[in-house]
Amino acid sequence: MEITWNDFEKVEMRVGTIIGVDDFPEARKPAYKLQIDFGPETGIRKSSAQITHRYKKEDLLQRQVVAVVNFPKKQIASFMSECLVLGAMGSDNDIVLLQPGAEVDNGLRIG
């Protein structure tokens, strides 16, 4: 499916730093609850991520990631997800987080 440049510009992807990671036992598939700091303009957002196979909780803290921050909130079990963390998904659904190649300021927009 082809999209227009105007469609792409509507997707607000920003860099944020993971500042909190908790287990999410209520999720249907193994997942973590993440708190991500997107800087002063966007603030701290929560997200659920099915990345327990590849990442330990302690390895995620202070890691920068890329997320879509302008999707509507989504209820996942008892948790309200406020952004979508992006990653590359392999054939076995193993997700590798998308992150900047060097540390950048939280909140920088991807474009």
Which positions does each model-derived feature cover?
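Phosphate-backbone binding interfaces of nucleic-acid-interacting proteins
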Residues: 1-111
